[in-house]
Amino acid sequence: RSIAPYVASKKSDPAVLVVDECGKFVISLLSGHLGGANELALKTAEILEAIPVVTTATDLHHRFAVDVFAKKNNCNIFNMKAAKEVSAALLAGKKVGFYSEFPTDGELPEGLVRCDEYGNPVSSMDDRSEEETQKSSDFNGTGTDCTNIDCGVAVTVHTSCNPFISTTQVVPKCLTLGMGCRKDKDARGIAEAAQKVLDRSGFHKEAFEQIASIDLKKEEKGILSLSQDWQIPFVTYTEEELKQVPGEFTPSPFVKKITGVDNVCERSAVLASGNGRLRQRKTGENGVTTAVAAREWRIHFE
């Protein structure tokens, strides 16, 4: 009863542990994965010299848990219903598809099958003979039985990426929104420009980790308002820092006259993302310019 007011959804529930009065058992009661209760229970039990009690099925059967994977890689999950289907399929011994827009380190966990953007299994020929990879049409020439792949995980920054009938999207925070604007541009105009970026690109808003601009805009109320609304930091750079950014950018004589640098939105986005790759070049409308860059990001499997 005491925790009832705090129980809302799997994505926001807090970690809750229960310890008996003798300190013999530490039970992970709520939010074992996303909230970190399972890991906390193990650490607490070690300190108390108690017995940890973890009841989540994927942990008991040593199966891949998409919510744990997302948390360890600092990603957001979309479609928790599909995430449950992933766990259920793995526990039932079925294959689960895995597609990623990003490179991966380590081997895929047991039960996951690497797929392309259309949900079709793909495989490396490194350790398979040609005969092994062409056993029958049921194996689609990949060495993997395709008939049981009904659900899967997609690591993506795009809202439209759904390779599987039931797709769990895992979205990394790796994008930077570069912005420039007229002085004292209203917050509504800034917000509308940002929304148009999402509409045009199909990027998840949750894939953005920061907003970037020139230091002349560090007190720009409209951008500060967007930063607060999206709950991400707003970073700025000097004219000299932006000039040093390598690459080819969309020049503007007017912008250079005002700021001293030929482009603000593209250069600031690239610089903030660690000299990352431009995913959307400069677009301008109603006194606001925007660009999107992505920092280098990889998936890590233990």
Model-found features: residue ranges?
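Short, surface-exposed, charge-dense and proline/glycine-enriched linear segments
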Residues: K43-P52, A82-A92, V235-Q244, E266-N275
